Amino acid sequence: MSRVGKYPVEVPAGVQVSVADGFFKAKGKLGELTVPVSRHVEVKIEGSNVSVAPVGRRSRENWTMWGTTRALIANTVKGVSDGFSKGLEIQGTGFRAAVQGSNLVMNLGFSHDVVYPIPEGIKITTPRPTAIVVEGNDKQRVGQVALDIRSFRKPEPYKGKGVRYETEVLRRKEGKKK
């Protein structure tokens, strides 16, 4: 069983945290985020640390929400102080991406360009035509936007063409033999 919940979350300088009405709020240089707090746990702010403890008797719900709530609070604090980023790579002949206004325009081998509107609170950059960087303060939204972009053309196992995460290792397959 994981013991993630027992470790306190350190709050860096410049981040203000509060707990009220079943919500944990964190405010920092990259914005403000709110996380709902389960009724199965209790959140305490002690100086520059935030600790989470299960409420009442030792039940499965209390213990599962203990670690989950602690992880959500840690992601919220890191998001408003440092932010999150996810890198994507595009492989394939003629495949490329560019940011035009508030849209990400990608050529992915279709007869048309793929236009993805950039959501509010997310920053997308293209350091080079075959690389995309998704940045933001909410870890879940950054991951979801990266997944949406990847889903336009998932990497195929034979030639490796498509959009992949920069840390993704693609299992290649061998083609048919005569």
Swiss-Prot record:
GO MF: rRNA binding; structural constituent of ribosome
Any single Pfam family the record assigns to this protein: Ribosomal_L6
Keywords: Ribonucleoprotein, Ribosomal protein, RNA-binding, rRNA-binding
GO annotation terms (biological process): cytoplasmic translation
GO CC terms in record: cytosolic large ribosomal subunit
PROSITE patterns: RIBOSOMAL_L6_1
SUPFAM superfamilies for the chain: Ribosomal protein L6 (SSF56053)
Assembly and oligomerization: Part of the 50S ribosomal subunit.
Function, in words: This protein binds to the 23S rRNA, and is important in its secondary structure. It is located near the subunit interface in the base of the L7/L12 stalk, and near the tRNA binding site of the peptidyltransferase center.
Protein name: Large ribosomal subunit protein uL6
Species annotation: Gluconobacter oxydans (strain 621H)
